[in-house]
Amino acid sequence: MWTRDIAYAAALGTALAAPEATRASLESRVCGGVVMQDTGTGGGWPVSTDRVAWALGAWSLYQSQGDKEWLRFAAAVLAATLEQDAAVLPAGEVLRPGETSFIDWREQSYPDWMTPADMAASYAFGTNVLHYLCRQLLARMLRELGDAARADVYAAEAAALAARIDERFWSEGCSHYGMMRTAEGYLDERVDSLATALAVLCGLAGDQALPLLQHLPRSLFGTPVFTPYKSLQEKAYHNRSVWPFVEAYVLMARAEEQDADGAAFSMSSMLRAAMAFGSNKENFQAESGEACDTIQNSDRQLWSVAGMLGLFYYGLFGIHYQDDNLVIAPCVPKSYRGSHWLTGLRIRNMVLDIHINGYGTEIWSVMVNGKPDSPIIPLDSQGRIQIELELMPTEDAEALALPPAASEDLPEPEWDAPTPELLRWKPVPGAASYNVFRNGVAFAAALDCHCVLPASRGYFNEYTVQAVNAQTSSCFSRPFECPAPGARVLVEPARVGEHAEYAVENGQAWLDTRACTSRLEYAPLELEPGTYSVRVFYSNASASLRDGDTCALRELMVDGVSAGVMLLPHNTEAGCWEVYARSAALVVQVEEAGLHTFSLCYTPRCRNANGEMNQCMVRQLEITRLK
């Protein structure tokens, strides 16, 4: 059982079709009063932080059943989950770091150079939309429960997160939200279809909702998970593929925006796949429409089945909730015109029989139990209710420009012995030019594969290169770091133990949750006042790169004061403890000149998803002056 599968499926339709099973499934993903994060890249939480998708399923179940006992349980679980997340977040950052929701095979979507540590420190558009939704829904839950004061707190958090999402993910040049922003500040401008649909459905997209949907790139057989595709990954899974549950969310967004043409495309994609395969496959190849040539697949996939329910419940029939009412707002494309029946649908104490005739998104007439009425049904209604809707045929809107076709990206540029004076990189096939960025900001454009750097560079600069042509671009290259002479030092580990009672041997230390290995002290270091980044060289081979729940966490203490929690995710395959990597950075402000102490400690904040295995090998700290 997967948290995200259950949650997305519940919101797509299982909360209506099978409420008891949905409740049991949602409850099964709660442990210790918080939502369980699915296993994933680098050992799961907090590299993966999309467990808050549970809120979508929990709220959908409440809407369909009206059970206040369930609502109290769900609100308590979500509040505790957000509190646990907050304990390991970077100080002062509104956005939530972590990998992209559900697109959790690193090699399929992320730049090749990014490690699990890099992903843990990056910011994904889709994951942040979920965190916004979670706070939005938790505020609504608390208002339903009469706790307006706490509801206001989460509503304010949601508003702050919405503003930050717009600020950090919106691309003015592309007029859409980018898929991901690296820890270094570079925006990956690929389109994430699920995230875009969710942003529309929760109101985050605002006036951009319809243009975003109308310009979602399409393949021959549906809306790809993301575009442009990653060109060097030929096998389809998240890359080069259509997932019916994602298409269902895109369809629901299109129906809400009364985009009948787009809805027809999504419906056709989903119905063709189900009929062609004789089952609800998890995914299929975007360009061939085949399900046999993807890396991993399955029949009767839960969220694909739920997506088909969503097609009818929320797409074609347009069922949605508004305050204390159920509203029927059909979206029937012209190619699906005719009569459509939905009978025996149980919502709270009602049983609905809905009949729609015609096509379009505008209602001509409504009959409720044989009498003229409106398509708005109070949620406290009881008994069997028959609803007849006649739609008003509408002329096709003025033809829009065709949506962009899905395309491939360019390969990432590779460095060719760059120096602090001259950046050099290898030519990228198909590239017309290159964009050079410094510290997350555009720095230069180059037709050739080099760029001369200025003599005065400050304490630290970081450069990356992007290949571009008229049709597409590449992901950013691995950052090239240029610390000034003397601005970067390595600090050796010195003593380990609850009271630092043991000397470190051979320059490395084993850390786990026992008292004798719960604290590691480094040699004192002379520093001037300024801003510094702190990283640690570590090894975590508790499980594979892609799986598990044993991401290690340690609190960084500077002069005895917490500077944040360091994430030390799996960096190699299970058992390969000789392979070391560099952690993501924590930024530290040093106020006074003199000797300063650094230590890594296991504290209550560092409890991981596993709860028991929380281990790693560590070597030096890397301390770099930034300002």
Task: Please provide the spans of the model-predicted regions.
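Aromatic-rich carbohydrate-recognition surfaces in CAZymes
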Residues: W2-I6, A10-E99, I103-D104, P111, ...
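Non-catalytic C-terminal accessory modules of carbohydrate-active enzymes
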Residues: S219, A253-L422
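Extended glycan-interaction surfaces of carbohydrate-active proteins
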Residues: M1, E20-W45, P90-Y123, A163-W243, ...
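Extracytoplasmic
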Residues: P479-K627
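Conserved aromatic anchor
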Residues: P420-G430
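Beta-strand-rich modules
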Residues: L453-S474
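Short beta-strand elements bearing conserved aromatic residues within extracellular beta-rich modules
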Residues: W364, S433-V436, R554-L556
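Short beta-strand segments within Ig-like beta-sandwich modules, predominantly Fibronectin type-III
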Residues: V441-D448
